[in-house]
Regions:
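Soluble non-cytosolic domains of exported or imported proteins
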Residues: 19-23, 85-86, 90, 114-118, ...
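Auxiliary, metal-adjacent structural segments of Zn-dependent hydrolase domains
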Residues: 10-69
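N-terminal accessory alpha/beta regions
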Residues: 1-11
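Active-site recognition of the HExxH zinc-binding catalytic motif
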Residues: 89-103, 121, 125
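Post-HExxH zinc-binding segment in Zn-dependent metallohydrolases
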Residues: 111-151, 220-222
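Inter-helical turn/loop segments and adjacent helix faces that build the functional surface
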Residues: 82, 104-114, 133-140, 196-201
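Pan-zinc metallopeptidase signature
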Residues: 156-222
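Short pre-active-site segment immediately N-terminal to the catalytic Zn-binding motif
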Residues: 75-91
Length: 222
């Protein structure tokens, strides 16, 4: 029989914190709607399974993804200390994705090129940081300034790549790239663009194309 003790403990932890999680979600959605309007979202909550346990741990006990303009999945491991503090940020990140779902073609993940993906994740992270500036995510400090420049020099020629496995390796890390390379570069790229164009509202920059965000940033492909 497979060992399900850990899974049972995670499920029990979610059930124990049910009211806390619900309140966090309600307050976070209120914060999010102050800048971007997207009502009637459905948020699905589940435990981290054995296959996802590593990445959930790397992300501080919360891993989430957007599966439509109205649907967000939260995978939680309450056994990992600090997950409560990261919960609002994770929801806000996916909320921005949900808002941009049709604009950014997020419904066709396999059709996204590397530039689409890097800018999409950077936008979502920037939005979450606007709401929760004191929260630090693992990818915020995954690369030093020198590391960001070096990794950009390696991947900038691949911006048009639609190779799903190559993109995943860059975004999350692989034998060839440090952990969270794509997320770190994406956040820094979008941050550099929007700090220089502070007059843009979240609604405006959420609807800007990846190419224009890249052009506005300090990151250059040449």
């Amino acid at each position: 029989m497979p060992d399900t003790t850990s899974l049972d403990s995670i499920i029990s932890g979610i059930e124990t914190n049910k009211v806390l999680i619900e309140n966090k979600i309600i307050h976070t959605l209120t914060d999010c709607r102050g800048y971007l309007k997207n009502d009637s979202l459905t948020i699905y909550i589940g435990p981290s399974n054995k296959r996802m346990k590593g990445i959930v741990g790397d992300c501080g006990g919360i891993y989430s993804w957007c599966i439509g303009n109205k649907d967000i999945i939260l995978m939680i491991d309450p056994q990992i200390q600090g997950w409560i503090g990261l919960l609002p940020f994770s929801i806000a990140h996916q909320y921005q994705h949900a808002y941009s779902w049709t604009k950014m073609n997020l419904g066709a993940l396999l059709a996204m090129n590397l530039m689409d993906r890097i800018v999409a994740e950077g936008k979502a992270d920037w939005y979450a940081h606007v709401l929760y500036p004191d929260v630090k995510m693992p990818w915020d400090t995954a690369l030093s300034d020198e590391g960001l420049q070096y990794q950009w020099s390696r991947i900038k020629a691949e911006m048009r790549s639609e190779d799903y496995y190559q993109i995943q390796g860059i975004m999350f890390g692989s034998d060839n790239y440090p952990e969270f390379t794509g997320y770190s570069v994406g956040f820094d790229l979008v941050q550099s663009a929007l700090k220089k164009n502070a007059a843009l509202t979240p609604e405006q920059w959420s609807n800007e194309s990846p190419a224009l965000i890249l052009e506005m940033s300090e990151y250059k492909t040449q």
